[in-house]
Protein backbone atom coordinates (compact mmCIF):
# COMPACT_ATOMS: atom_id res chain seq x y z
CA UNK A 1 0.00 0.00 0.00
CA UNK A 2 2.93 2.34 0.72
CA UNK A 3 5.01 1.05 -2.21
CA UNK A 4 6.99 -1.17 0.21
CA UNK A 5 8.63 1.88 1.84
CA UNK A 6 8.24 0.45 5.36
CA UNK A 7 9.74 -2.88 4.32
CA UNK A 8 12.67 -1.28 2.51
CA UNK A 9 13.43 1.11 5.40
CA UNK A 10 13.49 -1.55 8.13
CA UNK A 11 15.35 -4.02 5.90
CA UNK A 12 18.06 -1.40 5.35
CA UNK A 13 18.32 -0.24 8.97
CA UNK A 14 17.85 -3.53 10.83
CA UNK A 15 18.38 -6.51 8.51
CA UNK A 16 17.99 -10.04 9.93
CA UNK A 17 20.05 -12.65 8.12
CA UNK A 18 18.60 -15.81 9.64
CA UNK A 19 16.96 -18.35 7.35
CA UNK A 20 13.73 -19.05 9.24
CA UNK A 21 13.24 -15.48 10.54
CA UNK A 22 11.89 -12.40 8.79
CA UNK A 23 14.28 -10.29 6.74
CA UNK A 24 13.62 -7.35 9.09
CA UNK A 25 11.80 -6.77 12.43
CA UNK A 26 8.20 -5.93 11.55
CA UNK A 27 7.39 -3.31 14.18
CA UNK A 28 4.31 -2.22 12.24
CA UNK A 29 2.78 -5.65 12.82
CA UNK A 30 3.68 -5.44 16.50
CA UNK A 31 1.92 -2.07 16.73
CA UNK A 32 -1.23 -3.51 15.17
CA UNK A 33 -1.14 -6.45 17.60
CA UNK A 34 -0.81 -4.04 20.54
CA UNK A 35 -3.80 -2.04 19.26
CA UNK A 36 -6.01 -5.13 19.07
CA UNK A 37 -4.81 -6.34 22.47
CA UNK A 38 -5.83 -3.03 24.04
CA UNK A 39 -9.14 -3.11 22.16
CA UNK A 40 -9.97 -6.63 23.36
CA UNK A 41 -8.97 -5.69 26.90
CA UNK A 42 -11.56 -2.90 27.04
CA UNK A 43 -14.49 -5.29 26.89
CA UNK A 44 -16.66 -7.28 24.54
CA UNK A 45 -19.02 -4.45 23.58
CA UNK A 46 -16.41 -2.08 22.13
CA UNK A 47 -14.58 -4.98 20.48
CA UNK A 48 -17.79 -6.22 18.90
CA UNK A 49 -18.68 -2.75 17.58
CA UNK A 50 -15.24 -2.33 16.01
CA UNK A 51 -15.40 -5.79 14.45
CA UNK A 52 -18.90 -5.14 13.08
CA UNK A 53 -17.71 -1.92 11.43
CA UNK A 54 -14.70 -3.65 9.86
CA UNK A 55 -16.84 -6.59 8.72
CA UNK A 56 -19.35 -4.23 7.10
CA UNK A 57 -16.56 -2.35 5.30
CA UNK A 58 -15.10 -5.68 4.25
CA UNK A 59 -18.40 -6.79 2.68
CA UNK A 60 -18.83 -3.42 0.94
CA UNK A 61 -15.28 -3.69 -0.42
CA UNK A 62 -15.91 -7.20 -1.70
CA UNK A 63 -19.16 -6.16 -3.41
CA UNK A 64 -17.41 -3.15 -4.96
CA UNK A 65 -14.63 -5.35 -6.33
CA UNK A 66 -17.07 -7.94 -7.69
CA UNK A 67 -19.37 -5.39 -9.36
CA UNK A 68 -16.41 -3.52 -10.87
CA UNK A 69 -14.88 -6.74 -12.21
CA UNK A 70 -18.17 -7.91 -13.74
CA UNK A 71 -17.91 -5.10 -16.28
CA UNK A 72 -14.62 -6.54 -17.59
CA UNK A 73 -15.33 -10.29 -17.48
CA UNK A 74 -13.86 -12.30 -20.35
CA UNK A 75 -14.54 -16.05 -20.41
CA UNK A 76 -11.53 -16.54 -22.69
CA UNK A 77 -9.26 -16.00 -19.67
CA UNK A 78 -10.30 -19.52 -18.58
CA UNK A 79 -9.37 -20.93 -22.00
CA UNK A 80 -5.89 -19.52 -22.49
CA UNK A 81 -3.65 -21.84 -24.48
CA UNK A 82 -0.08 -22.16 -23.27
CA UNK A 83 1.05 -21.42 -26.84
CA UNK A 84 -0.59 -17.99 -26.66
CA UNK A 85 1.44 -16.97 -23.61
CA UNK A 86 4.61 -14.97 -24.25
CA UNK A 87 7.97 -16.54 -23.48
CA UNK A 88 8.66 -14.40 -20.39
CA UNK A 89 5.66 -15.87 -18.55
CA UNK A 90 5.31 -19.29 -20.17
CA UNK A 91 7.67 -21.12 -17.82
CA UNK A 92 5.48 -20.15 -14.84
CA UNK A 93 2.13 -20.58 -16.59
CA UNK A 94 1.72 -24.35 -16.41
CA UNK A 95 -0.35 -25.96 -19.17
CA UNK A 96 -2.91 -23.20 -19.66
CA UNK A 97 -6.66 -23.70 -19.66
CA UNK A 98 -9.01 -23.77 -16.67
CA UNK A 99 -6.65 -25.85 -14.50
CA UNK A 100 -3.18 -24.82 -15.73
CA UNK A 101 -1.41 -26.78 -13.00
CA UNK A 102 -3.87 -29.69 -12.84
CA UNK A 103 -5.51 -31.19 -9.76
CA UNK A 104 -2.05 -31.75 -8.29
CA UNK A 105 -1.53 -27.98 -8.27
CA UNK A 106 -4.92 -27.40 -6.66
CA UNK A 107 -4.21 -29.91 -3.89
CA UNK A 108 -0.67 -28.60 -3.33
CA UNK A 109 -2.00 -25.04 -2.88
CA UNK A 110 -4.90 -26.06 -0.64
CA UNK A 111 -3.02 -25.85 2.71
CA UNK A 112 -2.03 -22.23 2.00
CA UNK A 113 -5.58 -21.33 0.93
CA UNK A 114 -6.86 -23.07 4.03
CA UNK A 115 -5.52 -20.16 6.07
CA UNK A 116 -8.32 -18.02 4.65
CA UNK A 117 -10.96 -20.18 6.32
CA UNK A 118 -9.47 -20.15 9.81
CA UNK A 119 -11.57 -18.24 12.29
CA UNK A 120 -15.02 -19.66 11.60
CA UNK A 121 -14.62 -21.88 14.67
CA UNK A 122 -14.27 -18.78 16.87
CA UNK A 123 -18.03 -18.92 17.37
CA UNK A 124 -17.59 -21.99 19.56
CA UNK A 125 -15.38 -20.01 21.93
CA UNK A 126 -18.18 -17.50 22.47
CA UNK A 127 -20.50 -20.07 24.07
CA UNK A 128 -20.52 -18.22 27.39
CA UNK A 129 -21.67 -15.01 25.68
CA UNK A 130 -24.37 -16.75 23.56
CA UNK A 131 -28.00 -16.68 24.75
CA UNK A 132 -28.73 -20.23 23.58
CA UNK A 133 -25.35 -21.84 22.79
CA UNK A 134 -26.72 -25.33 22.05
CA UNK A 135 -28.74 -23.90 19.19
CA UNK A 136 -26.85 -20.75 18.22
CA UNK A 137 -23.25 -22.05 18.05
CA UNK A 138 -23.83 -24.81 15.43
CA UNK A 139 -25.94 -22.43 13.33
CA UNK A 140 -23.28 -19.71 13.58
CA UNK A 141 -20.53 -22.11 12.47
CA UNK A 142 -22.51 -23.32 9.45
CA UNK A 143 -23.51 -19.79 8.39
CA UNK A 144 -19.92 -18.55 8.80
CA UNK A 145 -18.59 -21.37 6.63
CA UNK A 146 -21.23 -20.80 3.97
CA UNK A 147 -20.58 -17.04 3.78
CA UNK A 148 -16.81 -17.58 3.68
CA UNK A 149 -17.11 -20.20 0.94
CA UNK A 150 -19.35 -18.03 -1.23
CA UNK A 151 -17.12 -14.98 -0.71
CA UNK A 152 -13.91 -16.72 -1.77
CA UNK A 153 -15.66 -18.50 -4.63
CA UNK A 154 -17.07 -15.24 -5.98
CA UNK A 155 -13.91 -13.13 -5.79
CA UNK A 156 -11.65 -15.87 -7.18
CA UNK A 157 -14.08 -16.36 -10.07
CA UNK A 158 -14.29 -12.71 -11.12
CA UNK A 159 -10.60 -11.91 -10.72
CA UNK A 160 -9.50 -14.82 -12.92
CA UNK A 161 -12.12 -13.92 -15.53
CA UNK A 162 -10.96 -10.28 -15.63
CA UNK A 163 -7.17 -10.77 -15.73
CA UNK A 164 -5.06 -13.73 -16.99
CA UNK A 165 -3.98 -16.02 -14.17
CA UNK A 166 -0.27 -15.86 -15.03
CA UNK A 167 -0.25 -12.04 -14.74
CA UNK A 168 -1.79 -11.96 -11.25
CA UNK A 169 0.09 -10.44 -8.31
CA UNK A 170 -0.13 -12.97 -5.48
CA UNK A 171 0.69 -10.32 -2.86
CA UNK A 172 -2.06 -7.83 -3.81
CA UNK A 173 -4.35 -9.37 -6.42
CA UNK A 174 -7.22 -6.87 -6.66
CA UNK A 175 -5.17 -3.64 -6.32
CA UNK A 176 -2.81 -4.93 -9.02
CA UNK A 177 -5.67 -5.77 -11.41
CA UNK A 178 -7.37 -2.39 -10.95
CA UNK A 179 -4.05 -0.60 -11.38
CA UNK A 180 -3.48 -2.45 -14.66
CA UNK A 181 -7.01 -1.53 -15.76
CA UNK A 182 -6.32 2.13 -14.94
CA UNK A 183 -8.96 2.34 -12.21
CA UNK A 184 -6.85 4.09 -9.57
CA UNK A 185 -9.81 5.22 -7.47
CA UNK A 186 -11.24 1.71 -7.20
CA UNK A 187 -7.75 0.43 -6.41
CA UNK A 188 -7.47 2.61 -3.30
CA UNK A 189 -11.00 1.76 -2.17
CA UNK A 190 -10.08 -1.92 -2.38
CA UNK A 191 -6.75 -1.35 -0.64
CA UNK A 192 -8.36 0.37 2.35
CA UNK A 193 -11.11 -2.24 2.44
CA UNK A 194 -8.55 -5.03 2.39
CA UNK A 195 -7.00 -3.55 5.52
CA UNK A 196 -10.41 -3.85 7.21
CA UNK A 197 -10.59 -7.46 6.01
CA UNK A 198 -7.25 -8.19 7.68
CA UNK A 199 -8.55 -6.51 10.83
CA UNK A 200 -11.56 -8.84 11.05
CA UNK A 201 -9.33 -11.88 10.53
CA UNK A 202 -6.91 -10.72 13.20
CA UNK A 203 -9.75 -9.89 15.57
CA UNK A 204 -11.14 -13.41 15.19
CA UNK A 205 -7.79 -14.99 16.03
CA UNK A 206 -6.97 -12.68 18.93
CA UNK A 207 -10.49 -12.98 20.35
CA UNK A 208 -10.23 -16.77 20.46
CA UNK A 209 -6.81 -17.16 22.06
CA UNK A 210 -7.46 -15.48 25.44
CA UNK A 211 -10.63 -17.55 25.89
CA UNK A 212 -8.78 -20.77 25.13
CA UNK A 213 -6.13 -19.78 27.67
CA UNK A 214 -8.88 -18.86 30.14
CA UNK A 215 -10.58 -22.26 29.73
CA UNK A 216 -7.29 -24.11 30.22
CA UNK A 217 -6.30 -21.99 33.23
CA UNK A 218 -9.75 -22.34 34.78
CA UNK A 219 -9.31 -26.12 34.72
CA UNK A 220 -5.77 -25.90 36.08
CA UNK A 221 -3.95 -27.09 32.95
CA UNK A 222 -1.91 -23.87 33.06
CA UNK A 223 -1.44 -21.23 35.75
CA UNK A 224 -4.67 -20.26 37.53
CA UNK A 225 -3.81 -16.56 37.45
CA UNK A 226 -4.53 -16.58 33.70
CA UNK A 227 -8.20 -17.37 34.39
CA UNK A 228 -8.87 -14.17 36.34
CA UNK A 229 -11.68 -12.06 34.84
CA UNK A 230 -11.42 -8.30 35.23
CA UNK A 231 -14.37 -6.96 37.24
CA UNK A 232 -14.70 -3.83 35.07
CA UNK A 233 -14.22 -5.10 31.51
CA UNK A 234 -15.54 -8.63 32.19
CA UNK A 235 -12.73 -10.08 30.08
CA UNK A 236 -9.83 -12.45 30.90
CA UNK A 237 -7.45 -9.49 31.04
CA UNK A 238 -4.22 -11.28 31.99
CA UNK A 239 -4.78 -13.97 29.36
CA UNK A 240 -5.49 -11.29 26.74
CA UNK A 241 -2.31 -9.35 27.54
CA UNK A 242 -0.12 -12.48 27.63
CA UNK A 243 -1.46 -13.86 24.35
CA UNK A 244 -1.07 -10.43 22.73
CA UNK A 245 2.53 -10.13 23.93
CA UNK A 246 3.49 -13.55 22.58
CA UNK A 247 1.70 -12.86 19.27
CA UNK A 248 3.47 -9.49 18.98
CA UNK A 249 6.94 -10.98 19.41
CA UNK A 250 6.24 -13.81 16.97
CA UNK A 251 4.85 -11.56 14.22
CA UNK A 252 7.78 -9.16 14.61
CA UNK A 253 10.53 -11.69 14.01
CA UNK A 254 9.03 -14.68 12.15
CA UNK A 255 8.66 -14.70 8.36
CA UNK A 256 5.08 -14.19 7.15
CA UNK A 257 5.01 -17.26 4.89
CA UNK A 258 6.27 -19.40 7.76
CA UNK A 259 3.64 -17.93 10.09
CA UNK A 260 0.93 -18.85 7.58
CA UNK A 261 2.24 -22.43 7.45
CA UNK A 262 2.39 -22.63 11.26
CA UNK A 263 -1.14 -21.29 11.52
CA UNK A 264 -2.33 -23.76 8.89
CA UNK A 265 -0.84 -26.84 10.51
CA UNK A 266 -2.11 -25.74 13.94
CA UNK A 267 -5.61 -25.24 12.54
CA UNK A 268 -5.52 -28.57 10.73
CA UNK A 269 -4.48 -30.31 13.94
CA UNK A 270 -7.37 -28.65 15.77
CA UNK A 271 -9.77 -29.70 13.03
CA UNK A 272 -8.40 -33.25 13.31
CA UNK A 273 -8.90 -33.37 17.07
CA UNK A 274 -12.55 -32.30 16.72
CA UNK A 275 -13.73 -35.31 14.64
CA UNK A 276 -11.64 -37.62 16.81
CA UNK A 277 -13.41 -36.18 19.87
CA UNK A 278 -16.76 -36.66 18.12
CA UNK A 279 -15.96 -40.35 17.62
CA UNK A 280 -14.76 -40.83 21.21
CA UNK A 281 -17.91 -39.23 22.62
CA UNK A 282 -20.14 -41.14 20.19
CA UNK A 283 -18.92 -44.47 21.57
CA UNK A 284 -18.61 -43.38 25.20
CA UNK A 285 -19.87 -45.93 27.73
CA UNK A 286 -23.44 -45.33 28.88
CA UNK A 287 -23.35 -44.10 32.47
CA UNK A 288 -26.40 -45.97 33.73
CA UNK A 289 -25.14 -49.41 32.66
CA UNK A 290 -22.99 -51.20 35.20
CA UNK A 291 -21.80 -54.71 34.43
CA UNK A 292 -20.38 -57.06 36.99
CA UNK A 293 -17.53 -58.93 35.35
CA UNK A 294 -15.51 -61.59 37.07
CA UNK A 295 -11.76 -61.98 36.65
CA UNK A 296 -12.25 -65.08 34.51
CA UNK A 297 -14.81 -63.37 32.27
CA UNK A 298 -12.57 -60.34 31.79
CA UNK A 299 -10.06 -62.48 29.90
CA UNK A 300 -11.28 -62.56 26.31
CA UNK A 301 -10.78 -65.96 24.64
CA UNK A 302 -9.13 -65.78 21.25
CA UNK A 303 -12.27 -67.23 19.65
CA UNK A 304 -14.28 -64.25 20.94
CA UNK A 305 -11.95 -61.47 19.77
CA UNK A 306 -13.50 -61.25 16.29
CA UNK A 307 -16.95 -61.54 17.83
CA UNK A 308 -16.31 -58.57 20.11
CA UNK A 309 -14.46 -56.47 17.52
CA UNK A 310 -17.34 -56.71 15.05
CA UNK A 311 -20.10 -56.97 17.68
CA UNK A 312 -21.51 -60.18 16.19
CA UNK A 313 -23.90 -60.45 19.15
CA UNK A 314 -25.53 -57.17 18.01
CA UNK A 315 -25.14 -55.55 21.43
CA UNK A 316 -27.07 -52.26 21.48
CA UNK A 317 -25.91 -50.67 24.75
CA UNK A 318 -22.43 -49.14 24.97
CA UNK A 319 -20.25 -50.37 27.82
CA UNK A 320 -16.71 -49.73 28.97
CA UNK A 321 -15.58 -52.71 26.92
CA UNK A 322 -17.22 -51.55 23.67
CA UNK A 323 -15.99 -48.02 24.33
CA UNK A 324 -12.44 -49.33 24.80
CA UNK A 325 -12.64 -51.25 21.51
CA UNK A 326 -13.92 -48.16 19.70
CA UNK A 327 -11.21 -45.94 21.20
CA UNK A 328 -8.49 -48.38 20.12
CA UNK A 329 -9.96 -48.44 16.60
CA UNK A 330 -10.03 -44.62 16.53
CA UNK A 331 -6.38 -44.39 17.63
CA UNK A 332 -5.30 -46.98 15.06
CA UNK A 333 -7.30 -45.17 12.39
CA UNK A 334 -5.47 -41.88 13.06
CA UNK A 335 -2.05 -43.58 12.97
CA UNK A 336 -2.94 -45.48 9.80
CA UNK A 337 -4.27 -42.28 8.21
CA UNK A 338 -0.87 -40.63 8.84
CA UNK A 339 0.88 -43.51 7.09
CA UNK A 340 -1.69 -43.58 4.27
CA UNK A 341 -1.40 -39.85 3.53
CA UNK A 342 2.40 -39.99 3.74
CA UNK A 343 2.35 -42.70 1.07
CA UNK A 344 0.04 -40.60 -1.12
CA UNK A 345 2.21 -37.48 -0.86
CA UNK A 346 5.75 -38.85 -0.66
CA UNK A 347 5.50 -42.57 -1.44
CA UNK A 348 5.91 -42.27 -5.22
CA UNK A 349 9.29 -40.53 -4.88
CA UNK A 350 10.59 -42.68 -2.00
CA UNK A 351 9.24 -46.24 -2.41
CA UNK A 352 9.72 -48.69 -5.30
CA UNK A 353 6.62 -48.95 -7.48
CA UNK A 354 5.60 -52.43 -6.28
CA UNK A 355 6.12 -51.53 -2.62
CA UNK A 356 4.19 -48.30 -3.14
CA UNK A 357 1.08 -50.10 -4.35
CA UNK A 358 1.38 -52.81 -1.69
CA UNK A 359 1.58 -50.22 1.11
CA UNK A 360 -1.19 -48.11 -0.42
CA UNK A 361 -3.63 -51.02 -0.80
CA UNK A 362 -2.76 -52.38 2.67
CA UNK A 363 -3.45 -49.06 4.39
CA UNK A 364 -6.74 -48.61 2.49
CA UNK A 365 -7.89 -52.07 3.60
CA UNK A 366 -6.78 -51.28 7.16
CA UNK A 367 -8.70 -47.99 7.20
CA UNK A 368 -11.87 -49.68 5.90
CA UNK A 369 -11.63 -52.46 8.50
CA UNK A 370 -11.22 -49.93 11.31
CA UNK A 371 -14.25 -47.99 10.07
CA UNK A 372 -16.29 -51.22 10.04
CA UNK A 373 -15.16 -51.99 13.62
CA UNK A 374 -16.26 -48.52 14.75
CA UNK A 375 -19.52 -48.82 12.83
CA UNK A 376 -20.37 -52.09 14.56
CA UNK A 377 -19.86 -50.77 18.10
CA UNK A 378 -22.97 -49.58 20.01
CA UNK A 379 -23.27 -45.82 20.38
CA UNK A 380 -23.87 -43.79 23.53
CA UNK A 381 -27.52 -43.02 24.25
CA UNK A 382 -26.76 -39.49 25.49
CA UNK A 383 -29.27 -36.89 24.30
CA UNK A 384 -27.57 -34.23 22.16
CA UNK A 385 -28.99 -31.07 20.61
CA UNK A 386 -26.50 -31.19 17.75
CA UNK A 387 -25.20 -34.50 16.41
CA UNK A 388 -22.85 -35.14 13.50
CA UNK A 389 -24.66 -37.29 10.91
CA UNK A 390 -23.27 -40.35 9.11
CA UNK A 391 -20.84 -41.30 11.88
CA UNK A 392 -18.17 -42.65 11.66
CA UNK A 393 -17.86 -41.90 7.91
CA UNK A 394 -17.86 -38.08 8.04
CA UNK A 395 -15.49 -37.81 11.07
CA UNK A 396 -13.10 -40.38 9.54
CA UNK A 397 -13.14 -38.59 6.18
CA UNK A 398 -12.45 -35.30 7.98
CA UNK A 399 -9.48 -36.81 9.84
CA UNK A 400 -8.01 -38.24 6.62
CA UNK A 401 -8.42 -35.01 4.62
CA UNK A 402 -6.92 -32.85 7.38
CA UNK A 403 -3.90 -35.11 7.80
CA UNK A 404 -3.45 -35.21 4.01
CA UNK A 405 -3.32 -31.40 3.91
CA UNK A 406 -0.84 -31.40 6.79
CA UNK A 407 1.41 -33.70 4.78
CA UNK A 408 1.57 -31.08 2.01
CA UNK A 409 3.44 -28.64 4.28
CA UNK A 410 7.22 -28.32 4.28
CA UNK A 411 9.69 -29.98 6.64
CA UNK A 412 10.54 -26.82 8.60
CA UNK A 413 6.86 -26.30 9.42
CA UNK A 414 6.72 -29.84 10.81
CA UNK A 415 9.88 -29.26 12.86
CA UNK A 416 8.40 -26.11 14.39
CA UNK A 417 5.09 -27.87 14.92
CA UNK A 418 6.70 -30.82 16.72
CA UNK A 419 8.75 -28.38 18.84
CA UNK A 420 5.58 -26.61 19.99
CA UNK A 421 3.98 -29.98 20.77
CA UNK A 422 7.00 -30.97 22.86
CA UNK A 423 6.85 -27.69 24.80
CA UNK A 424 3.11 -28.12 25.34
CA UNK A 425 3.58 -31.71 26.48
CA UNK A 426 6.25 -30.68 28.97
CA UNK A 427 3.94 -28.04 30.44
CA UNK A 428 1.10 -30.57 30.66
CA UNK A 429 3.07 -33.40 32.27
CA UNK A 430 5.09 -31.11 34.56
CA UNK A 431 2.18 -28.92 35.72
CA UNK A 432 -1.18 -29.41 34.04
CA UNK A 433 -1.73 -33.09 34.76
CA UNK A 434 -1.21 -32.59 38.50
CA UNK A 435 -3.38 -29.47 38.78
CA UNK A 436 -6.21 -30.21 36.33
CA UNK A 437 -9.56 -30.17 38.15
CA UNK A 438 -11.04 -32.54 35.56
CA UNK A 439 -8.23 -35.00 36.25
CA UNK A 440 -8.57 -34.62 40.04
CA UNK A 441 -12.32 -35.29 39.86
CA UNK A 442 -11.64 -38.61 38.19
Stretches with model-predicted labels:
Residues 2-5, 56-91, 157-161, 271-289, ...:
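Hydrophobic alpha-helical segments and their helix-loop junctions in multi-pass secondary transporters
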Residues 2-44, 65, 83-84, 237-246, ...:
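Transmembrane alpha-helical segments of multi-pass small-molecule transport proteins
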Residues 22-30, 131-139, 143-152, 156, ...:
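Loop-to-transmembrane helix boundary motifs in multi-pass membrane proteins
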Residues 24-86, 118, 141-144, 260-274, ...:
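Membrane-interface loop-to-helix entry segments
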Residues 37-41, 66, 156-158, 195, ...:
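Alpha-helical transmembrane segments of multipass membrane proteins
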Residues 58, 68-71, 257, 262, ...:
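A generic transmembrane alpha-helix motif of multi-pass inner-membrane proteins
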Residues 112-131, 187-224, 251, 257-278, ...:
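Membrane-helix boundary/coupling elements in multi-pass transport proteins
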Amino acid sequence: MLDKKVEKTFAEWMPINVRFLATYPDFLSMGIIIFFTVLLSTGMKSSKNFNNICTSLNLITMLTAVVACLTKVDINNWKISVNDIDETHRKHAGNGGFLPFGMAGVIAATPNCFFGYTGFESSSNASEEAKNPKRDIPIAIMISLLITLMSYFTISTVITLVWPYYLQDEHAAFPHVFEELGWTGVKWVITVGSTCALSTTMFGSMYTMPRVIYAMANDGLIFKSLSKVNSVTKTPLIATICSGAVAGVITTFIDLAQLVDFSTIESLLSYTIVPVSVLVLRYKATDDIKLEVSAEESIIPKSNIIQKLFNLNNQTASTKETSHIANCAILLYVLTAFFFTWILVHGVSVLPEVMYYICLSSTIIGLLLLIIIMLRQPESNATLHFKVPCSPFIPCASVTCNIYLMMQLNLFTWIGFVSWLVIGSLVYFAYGMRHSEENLDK
